[in-house]
C-alpha cells in the first residue's frame, strides 16, 4: 500500500498534468481510443465517415454535371445526395449524443480520480499526521500552523502537505520548463550563427 505522503503527491501530479495538458485534450484522446474499441459507437463513427465521403463525392459529381444539359442525371444525383445527406445528419446527431454522454462520463471519472480523491483524503485523514516533526526543533506556533486544522501538534497535517505538494510540483515544473527553453535557445543559437556566417 502506498504511503499517505506518496498518495497525496501522486494525486497532485495527476491534477497538475490534467491542468497542464488540458481536460479537452484528454477527453478527445480518450474518445479517439474509445472509437478504436469494437463497440456500436465505433461502428456508428465508421458509418458516419463513410456517409460523409459519399455526400462529398455526390456533391462533387453534382457540381460537375450541368443541371440544364443533363437534367435527368443531375436530378438522380441530387436525390442520392439528399438521401445520403439525411442519413449523414441522422448518424451525426446520434454520434454527437453518444459523444456528449461519453464526455460527461469521462469528466466525472476524471474529477473523482483527481480532485474528488484529494478532497476525500483531506476529510478522511484530517486527524492523521502525514509525518511527525522532530521534538523541540520548531517553536509552538510553527508546529500549530503545520498541524492545522486537526492533526496532532508536532506533526504535519494533510491540508498542509497538500499545499506543499501543489506548490512544489508547480515550482519544479516551472524550473524544468525554463531549463528546457534555455537549452533549446542555446542549441538554436549556434545554428543561426552558422547560417549568418555562410550568408556573409
Curated annotation (Swiss-Prot):
One of its GO terms (molecular function) is protein-membrane adaptor activity. Its main location: endoplasmic reticulum. GO terms for biological process: tail-anchored membrane protein insertion into ER membrane. Interacts with get3. Residues 1-4, 132-155 are lumenal. It is found in: Endoplasmic reticulum membrane. The gene is get1. Pfam families: CHD5. It comes from the Eukaryota. This is Protein get1. Keywords: Coiled coil, Endoplasmic reticulum, Membrane, Transmembrane, Transmembrane helix, Transport. It is a multi-pass membrane protein. One of its GO terms (cellular component) is GET complex. Belongs to the WRB/GET1 family. Required for the post-translational delivery of tail-anchored (TA) proteins to the endoplasmic reticulum. Acts as a membrane receptor for soluble get3, which recognizes and selectively binds the transmembrane domain of TA proteins in the cytosol. Residues 42-100 form a coiled coil. The chain crosses the membrane at residues 5-24, 111-131, 156-172. Residues 25-110, 173-200 are cytoplasmic.
Amino acid at each position: 500500500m502506498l504511503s499517505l505522503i506518496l498518495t497525496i503527491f501522486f494525486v497532485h501530479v495527476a491534477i497538475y498534468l490534467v491542468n497542464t495538458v488540458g481536460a479537452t485534450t484528454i477527453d478527445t484522446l480518450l474518445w479517439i481510443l474509445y472509437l478504436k474499441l469494437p463497440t456500436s459507437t465505433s461502428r456508428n463513427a465508421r458509418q458516419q465517415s463513410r456517409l460523409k465521403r459519399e455526400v462529398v463525392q455526390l456533391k462533387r459529381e453534382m457540381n460537375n454535371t450541368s443541371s440544364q444539359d443533363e437534367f435527368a442525371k443531375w436530378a438522380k444525383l441530387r436525390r442520392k445526395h439528399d438521401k445520403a445527406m439525411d442519413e449523414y445528419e441522422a448518424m451525426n446527431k446520434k454520434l454527437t449524443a453518444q459523444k456528449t454522454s461519453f464526455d460527461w462520463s469521462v469528466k466525472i471519472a476524471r474529477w473523482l480520480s483527481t480532485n474528488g480523491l484529494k478532497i476525500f483524503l483531506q476529510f478522511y485523514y484530517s486527524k492523521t499526521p502525514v509525518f511527525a516533526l522532530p521534538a523541540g526543533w520548531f517553536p509552538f506556533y510553527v508546529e500549530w500552523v503545520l498541524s492545522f486544522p486537526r492533526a496532532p501538534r508536532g506533526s504535519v497535517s494533510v491540508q498542509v502537505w497538500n499545499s506543499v505538494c501543489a506548490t512544489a510540483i508547480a515550482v519544479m515544473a516551472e524550473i524544468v520548463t525554463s531549463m528546457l527553453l534555455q537549452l533549446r535557445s542555446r542549441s538554436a543559437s549556434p545554428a543561426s550563427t552558422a547560417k549568418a556566417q555562410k550568408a556573409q
